[in-house]
Amino acid sequence: METKKERLVLRRPIGKHEERSYLEVAFAVEGPVERIDIAYRYERGGASGPVVDIGLRSPERIVGWSGGAREAFFVGTEKATPGYLAGPIAEGEWAVLLGAYKIPEGGAEVIVEVEFARPHGRWMKGDLHMHSVHSDGSYTMEQAKDSCKSRGLEFMALTDHNTASQNFAALAPDEQLLLIPGVELTSYFGHANVLGVPDALRDFRVTTPEQAEEALGEARERGGFVSLNHPFCPSCPWELGFDVPFDAIEVWNGPWRTLNERALAWWQEQLAQGRRIIALGGSDAHREDRFVKHGRPTASVWTEADTVQGVLAGIRQGRVVLQFDPDETCMALASGKYGIGDTIPRHAVEEQGGVPLTIDICSAKGDRVALWSDRGIEAVWDIVVPADNSDAGGWEAEAAEAGWTVQREIAAILAFDAQEDKGCVPAIPAGASAESGVAPQRIEAENAHVRLRFQGSADRLFYRLEARRDVEGLKRSVMTCMTNPVYVEQA
């Protein structure tokens, strides 16, 4: 969703008599604003022409100064151009500061453009699980940030093992990336992320369910969001029970594999029993790797603000879609004005005569999309991309460039499953996998985008979507996208 911006064009003539003085071009900020973009220009005129510097003040203080080094800059609540301070944008009189360093006899005219971005809903993409040199990763903080930016991500969670030092090493706001503070509680009996608080854990040394309950409960009291990580991983499963305080489960950890299928099946069972648990995913990236990469999977979060708290609010509401890659298949599910993470109220169900669903699918490349409810799979669609629009992309193109076939690439990813189970990892329950007796409908998608409609039933607890892609020569499919549910209020 594009930002709706309001634009001002301001002009300030500068006379020779004002040379070597500081001038203000005032403008008013009214109502909520999350970002201000400023650009300026004037006729330079070569060596004998004017030289005008620029900066910015708020109603309270000087916000920053570029001198003559920049022609444009921005300030936001949590991001800003280097040389400027991020922070809440207060209402009142602001001013662009002009430094009239050199002004010719004929004077100069400076044109200043000011754009305001109001808070608005938008999808933001990021990675909610990664490591750095602050624990057992090899990425420095700058390397991790650069990697995430190169992948087109807009936020990253700092989740090193049992330490908060990474959060304090990244105190300065980044111009392009939101940095979500976090920690991965890493015990000998399982791992859990705590997001949103720089120093959430008092003590990570938990060895019993009671100690885990105390530690995670205290983290939540401090404002932390708790996600149980890779709970069915053969080498580090969650063995402290599911009665501890938590908000989400990491259904998708790194490449799609059996441990994720088991987490997905468990999550589906909990949803079908009426329990509301948010599904999350993250790369768990530690170092450069062909398969484990920042943003694989990507968490797309619907947020009302380009801030850490805005992203966390979207996550807490369950407004999360998980994608294999930042540019891979993405889906949206809605019933009228109620979307992913929302509960459709009973009065709306009755007024609509059920639950009419709208399904939007973007960037699909031959995926099979399944609509799930608490009863299982309700409908299946095969998304067929016309031949002239079916060029390989994402990880498929990457594999080809590396000289690998897609089959070998995915086969190597699935080799992660070679780890021996510890005996505490449950089998995938019958009926909880993507296998279904529902006949798929063939849908041709022009430019890999399609909109579908489905008439849902009022007696379902929820609806959610999965998209998978079969790989020729393998008996397994790879998840390309999945949504959190849209819930249905029951009578």
Regions found by a protein language model. Give the residues of each.
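Extracellular and analogous surface-interaction loops
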Residues: 25-34, 84-90, 349-351
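Surface-exposed beta-strand/loop patches in noncatalytic accessory domains
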Residues: 2-18, 40-81, 377-379
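Noncatalytic modules at the cell exterior or secretory-pathway interfaces
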Residues: 34-37, 86-105, 460-464
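Solvent-exposed, flexible loop/coil segments flanking beta-strands in beta-rich domains
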Residues: 1-42, 113-124
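Beta-sandwich interaction modules
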Residues: 71-90, 451-455
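Edge beta-strands of jelly-roll/beta-sandwich modules across compartments, strongly enriched
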Residues: 48-50, 104-115
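Charged catalytic cores and adjacent phosphate/nucleic-acid-binding surfaces used
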Residues: 113-118, 188-202, 235-491
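Catalytic cores of extracellular degradative/oxidative enzymes
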Residues: 133-275, 283, 289
